[in-house]
Amino acid sequence: LRVASVENGSDYLALLLRKLGQQVSKTPGWFDEDPVELFRQHVWMNPFWEDDVYELVDLMGADHVIFGSDWPHIEGMPSPLDYLTEVKELDNDDRRLVMRDNTRSLTEPRPA
């Protein structure tokens, strides 16, 4: 299962992952697998352009963050390529993942 979370931003994610982790510790034996790790394996996050992309990369890994411009909507960036300045501190490989490769691999058909 692969899920892309778009049009939601990512500011809520730290709280969600913390709550999932707390639930695991409060209900030992209820989960066959760690729900935090399952979330990280199966969900790709598209932050709003004003969200902290570096925090999101720390939470999910660069391989599960996807770029989306929301252009031409008013809440989107007027020039989507300006987002490159928002990810300038990522290394080249991670920047390429976020800006292109993750979405590409997420939307490519998978073998049956």
Predicted regions: what is each one?
Residues 69:
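Single, functionally critical "micro-switch" positions that shape active/binding sites
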